[in-house]
Amino acid sequence: MKETSFWGETPSLSFADDTDKPLSDRTASPPCDPASSLQTALDTAAAQGQTTRENVLSILRRHLGSGNATVRREFEKRRMSGIDAARALARQADDMVCALAELAAQKHESPGETLCLCATGGYGAGLLAPFSDIDILFLIPGDPTPAMTARIEFILYALWDLGLRVGHATRSIAECVRDADSDLTIRTALLDLRFLHGERGLARDLRCALGADLQNDRLCEFVMGKIAEREQRHRRFGDNPYMVEPNIKEGRGGLRDLQTLNWMGRAALGCAVSTPDRSGQPAEAPQTPSFASFGLLTDRESLRARRSWDFLWTVRLHLHYITGRAEERLTFDVQPVIGGRMGYATHGRQRGVERFMRHYFLTARDVMRLTSVLQPVVLMHLQDQTTGEPPKVVPGPEEFQTIAGRICPIEPVTFAAQPREMFRLLDCGRRHDLPLHPIAMQQIIRNERHAVTLRDDPETAKIFLDLLCEPSADETKAVPFWLPILNETGLLGRLLPDWSRVVGQMQFDSYHIYTVDEHIVEAVRMMGQIEAGRMADEIPLAYTLASDLRSRRALYVAVLLHDIGKGRGGDHSEIGADLALTICPQLGLDPEETDTVSWLVLHHLLLSQTAFTRDIDDPRTILDLADTIQSPERLRLLLLLTIADMRAVSPKVWNAWKATLLRELFSRVAEVLEGGLAATERDSRVNHARELARDGLTGILPESSIDRFLDLGYPSYWLGFDTDTQMRHARMVHDSDRYRSPVTVEAYPIPERGVTELTVLCADHPGLFSQIAGALAVSGASIVDARIHTLSDGMALDTFWVQDGEGCSFEEPHQLGRLNHLVEQALSGRLDIRKGIEDASHHSTSRRMRAIHVPPRVVIDNTASDRHTVIEVNGRDRPGLLHDVTSALSSASLQISSAHITTYGMRAVDVFYVRDLLGMKITDPVRLARLRETLLASLTSAPVTTPAS
């Protein structure tokens, strides 16, 4: 029989292995009972008269260390589940607390006084992570006497001496009730009250008092407070559960969300997602029944809830043990380690760490779905309890109903028999500006598996396209962004089978901060924002193009499908283009739209790769691009797709400089598609640029200086800079001649483009680029582009566009002065570049980023340019990388004409247009092979050595 999952029948998943089985279902070999051996050791010590505090602490410390080591060993050998290990650690702590409480009662007798020790919070729930606090409540009848205070202090100081992290409070029952009324955190911690030692009656009375107090308005206030607290926590730790370095405890879909469901359920309904360990509780404390036992969860949902608890606790314990601290963030450096320990190996093209993280993200999604299923039950029960009547239901549009202004189905059971009604409900909400009621979300989640029958249904396809193409760009409306709802409920994966392959799929790099499915959802949202004009100030060209779309449906579907091929392995652009040919007709697109979508998906990286890694001043670059695109309409659509894609990768990926490059590339290709860039026109442009420069310089510089400057530049120079920049260059040349300066450096900020333009004028010589790159590396500047021009008099006029560590321009005078000074020092031989780079390297890459592997790669292309050999170098980004690579090029006797520098997280892609000393391409196979070896060597952190001739 096919295995059923939380939400229905599940296909065989590529990440499923032994870890997909609930850990609690595996054969476990629990360690020996530490409590009995501890008591034996204490009894033996007492019989021998070794009852001093130091003697007892030595015994406790030895047993605590031995017990914790046993738990860790059994857990890491995968003979104990995460839940079982957490319970064992809690029992270890119980043994320590109870032994010290017993000793304290003997050492500090206080006749007539009663004391009750209770565990609270997560420790009270009987679960403890290796480096978490143990929270203890010292419950007393009234004000503590000096003897009672000494007794409590004895316990606390001893626990601290044992190295335990202790959170504690000393309160009476009345104080507990009072503080719980005023503090949500205290109220929550006391929900997990668990008796440890002393007077049981106090614990029983406190539980009764808290239960009597948590009724009606206070109960409603508590539940709504936990919901608000959860939303605030999500905003703080990442509202998106699919960020690639999630917080497994506090983030959305993490352990705290499951605990919140437990707290709300127990307070409002007397049941919980899972039953905590109540060993050691007094007999009068009944076990909390589960939601499933009340019929509030299906068997599939209950199974998935238990697996989620187990999986998240297992990950959390590994995280604590590996880092040696109470670490809750699943960072890049620990992900492969935990994945390996949990048995995730590489399968095909998918790495073990990616399979592990996909399992994590699918678990987080299950937790969010569980919240959507259970929270409506709790809230509706609260309303019944506080008002005495059910919520007011009024007829809604199109045979639906509304509850508190939110749309809801009249008969949820109809979704199973008529799955199209789920899409009709969403579409009705879209057209009438009605958000979904939680009950609607609950029922869609429970019935989404029936949507598989709608894959060839034209009406469903039409509704889906309407939902896709209206991504709630108007923030004044209360309606949601519909695509995340389709994704989170599972409807999208049922409608488009290949979508389910990218759900929860991460890419183990520091460039993409979202999983593939969440990145696509964000890209569609970004497309809606562009079209609505909310980014008109930032990207005016995109808004202008979006306001006159002729192929709107094709564009939105292309955004939806542009990365869907990543679920199959291989070239995702080619795979996605093929998938589009099948998916588009299924969605009701006509043949022309289908062809457009497939073409856009195939080429969705074309503009960005060309703009950031090719010389757009080279006519061959523009002509080849125009030959591929062919149509002005396709160029417009491709630019919009490119912008939406880039903006959805990460907030740090998009910047003003990249916007400038894309805009310039777009305008040049558009001009060619309209019939421009003929050779004769190129000559006239050069002459026109020279005349504009002359007109601008007249009256500023002597005529002789103007004539000299106009004779210095070659055609590529006059076509590569605007008139204002050329006028600045003319003044630099004039000042250099006037003052006979061997080196002239000028840093000019261009904040609207997000870069600082650094221009260097000096005698051309081998290694010049490398020296400047080294100086800039020492300064902390990142080079994003460079143009190298050798003037007709043999002087080099090199221009570098640089950014600071945040991707912005250098603007402060002291920053600009430092850039100039370091470059001048490097060119005069007064700067130790290697030492400066080594110093910068000590403060660069964090340990978590070093876990990301970036394979070195060198690609040499003699077809991309008519006059240059184009060399693309891929490697791990680090301070001085560009210096090392350009040193290697210089040692190979190559001249760099332009360089284009791009980083994708930790991966640097540096592209150089080079020629030999005679100005020719490099074509000799032996020389090319040697060049490739030299460049590969330069991609390591070792200094570059000059290759043998």
From Swiss-Prot:
User: What does the UniProt keyword field contain?
Assistant: Hydrolase, Magnesium, Multifunctional enzyme, Nucleotidyltransferase, Repeat, Transferase
Q: Which organism is it from?
A: Gluconobacter oxydans (strain 621H)
An example GO biological process term is: regulation of nitrogen utilization
Q: What is its EC number?
A: 2.7.7.59, 3.1.4.-
Catalyses: [protein-PII]-L-tyrosine + UTP = [protein-PII]-uridylyl-L-tyrosine + diphosphate; [protein-PII]-uridylyl-L-tyrosine + H2O = [protein-PII]-L-tyrosine + UMP + H(+)
- Which residue intervals make up region (Uridylyl-removing)? 396-756
This one is known as: Bifunctional uridylyltransferase/uridylyl-removing enzyme
Say if the entry is tagged with keyword Cell cycle.
no
Report domain HD positions: 516-632
Regarding activators and inhibitors, the annotation says: Uridylyltransferase (UTase) activity is inhibited by glutamine, while glutamine activates uridylyl-removing (UR) activity.
Cofactor(s) listed: Mg(2+)
Ranges where the record places region Disordered: 1-37
Q: In which domain of life is the source organism classified?
A: Bacteria
Summarize the protein's role: Modifies, by uridylylation and deuridylylation, the PII regulatory proteins (GlnB and homologs), in response to the nitrogen status of the cell that GlnD senses through the glutamine level. Under low glutamine levels, catalyzes the conversion of the PII proteins and UTP to PII-UMP and PPi, while under higher glutamine levels, GlnD hydrolyzes PII-UMP to PII and UMP (deuridylylation). Thus, controls uridylylation state and activity of the PII proteins, and plays an important role in the regulation of nitrogen assimilation and metabolism.
SMART domains, A to Z = HDc (SM00471)
Record's family?
Answer: Belongs to the GlnD family.
Question: Region Uridylyltransferase: which residues?
Answer: 1-395
- Limits of the ACT domain: 757-834, 870-949
Q: GO molecular function, one example? A: phosphoric diester hydrolase activity
What does the entry note on its domains?
A: Has four distinct domains: an N-terminal nucleotidyltransferase (NT) domain responsible for UTase activity, a central HD domain that encodes UR activity, and two C-terminal ACT domains that seem to have a role in glutamine sensing.
Q: List the disulfide bonds.
A: none
